[in-house]
């Protein structure tokens, strides 16, 4: 049985900058970046066998996003969006020799690891068909996570560390949709 406790006191500081640019009705661009620092006042002992850490877990120092929308003709809209998530410290629980003997995961100690950073890019195209005066039928399609920015080192098996998950929530995905507005 594992019990989790809140950590000791902490200091979080940061800055967020955002901006938006538009050219007529054809082009819009919005972007933002957050720079932050999160530290415990005293080193936090998250596992009996791992070194204590002052840096907070799962809090990247840098995060950013952008959205660009282009409307070359009135019924067609093309949107490009991206999210940057900087490297962050994450916990990875130990796998005991007993659990490793089951053959699913090798034995390892509890460690705090720095993740890679991720850039997640997506694109969507939408075309509106207008019916009557106020009904719009939209067809859309796109790709999410074009560059397959996704965690590569998941634990596997019944004794995996189910909390060892970081990065974008979904792998590369293709989608299509229909929207009716009235």
Feature map (PLM): residue ranges:
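Gram-negative outer-membrane beta-barrel transporters
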Residues: 3-94
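Conserved C-terminal beta-signal and adjacent last beta-strands/turns
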Residues: 54-182
């Amino acid at each position: 049985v594992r019990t989790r406790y809140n950590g000791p006191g902490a200091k979080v500081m940061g800055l967020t900058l955002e901006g938006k640019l538009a050219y007529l009705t054809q082009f819009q661009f919005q972007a933002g970046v957050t720079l932050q620092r999160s530290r415990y006042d005293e080193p936090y002992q998250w596992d009996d066998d791992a070194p204590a850490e002052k840096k907070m877990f799962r809090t990247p120092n840098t995060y950013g996003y952008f959205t660009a929308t282009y409307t070359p003709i009135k019924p067609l809209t093309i949107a490009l969006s991206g999210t940057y998530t900087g490297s962050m410290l994450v916990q990875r629980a130990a796998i005991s020799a007993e659990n490793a003997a089951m053959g699913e995961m090798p034995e390892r100690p509890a460690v705090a690891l720095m993740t890679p950073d991720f850039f997640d890019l997506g694109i969507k195209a939408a075309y509106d068909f207008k019916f009557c005066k106020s009904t719009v039928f939209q067809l859309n399609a796109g790709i999410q996570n074009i560059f397959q920015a996704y965690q590569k080192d998941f634990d596997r098996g019944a004794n995996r560390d189910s909390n060892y998950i970081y990065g974008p929530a979904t792998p590369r995905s293709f989608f299509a949709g229909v929207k009716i507005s009235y």
